[in-house]
Amino acid sequence: MKFFLLFLVVLPIMGVLGKKNGYAVDSKGKAPECFLSNYCNNECTKVHYADKGYCCLLSCYCFGLNDDKKVLEISGTTKKYCDFTIIN
């Protein structure tokens, strides 16, 4: 019974660790610019190995990036806007 309870506590934490959202950057520190969401989904999933991506404020915003990927530093308001848009 204790093992089962421990499993229920640890499982959600494992899903959260290692994933983040943001503007993934290349080796030069720049996020890809965009006008279409399809381009960003391909860029995020195939180049940066994210779960998905879309165009948010003329740059590719990736959802579900690995923790070791570098992302562009953005304001909290921009991050909330892009996170909210991708969820809805």
From Swiss-Prot:
Cellular component terms per the entry's GO annotation: extracellular region
GO molecular function: sodium channel inhibitor activity; toxin activity
The LCN-type CS-alpha/beta domain, residue ranges: 20-83
Domain of life from the UniProt record: Eukaryota
Biological process, per Gene Ontology: defense response
Subcellular location: Secreted
Tissue specificity note: Expressed by the venom gland.
Signal sequence residues: 1-18
Key words, A-Z: Disulfide bond, Ion channel impairing toxin, Neurotoxin, Secreted, Signal, Toxin, Voltage-gated sodium channel impairing toxin
Main location: secreted
Disulfide bonds: C34-C55, C40-C60, C44-C62, C56-C82
CDD domains the record matches: neurotoxins_LC_scorpion
Comment field on protein domains: Has the structural arrangement of an alpha-helix connected to antiparallel beta-sheets by disulfide bonds (CS-alpha/beta).
Record-stated family: Belongs to the long (4 C-C) scorpion toxin superfamily. Sodium channel inhibitor family. Beta subfamily.
Function text: Excitatory insect toxins induce a spastic paralysis. They bind voltage-independently at site-4 of sodium channels (Nav) and shift the voltage of activation toward more negative potentials thereby affecting sodium channel activation and promoting spontaneous and repetitive firing.
Identification of the protein by name: Beta-insect excitatory toxin LqhIT1a
Species of the source: Leiurus hebraeus
